[in-house]
Amino acid sequence: MRYMVYFEVPIEVGNRIDFEEGGPGPIFGHIMERFAPDAVYSQAGMRAAFMVAELDEAQMTELMVVLSKKLGTYPEFTPIMSAEATMEVAAKAIIEAKKAP
């Protein structure tokens, strides 16, 4: 499934990584190569990014582990669907939700 992944790197971790050999390049290079995002947007003024990528369950878990262990952050995964798919999913979900006691 396609996801928008958002993460913020804590300032202490970012400062440490900036002064390591190669800076943030090696870890971000690994993330780009391994997960092949379609788009990456950095947030001006802070160490944060949005990434759009096609991920299965194992890749989501792997990315969460990489980001938490290497960058000290837990990513937020937001599913991305077309408008048509969203309408179809929402319609089914509402029907099922109405069955709840």
Predicted feature residues:
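Conserved, structured core segments of small domains
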Residues: M1-P101
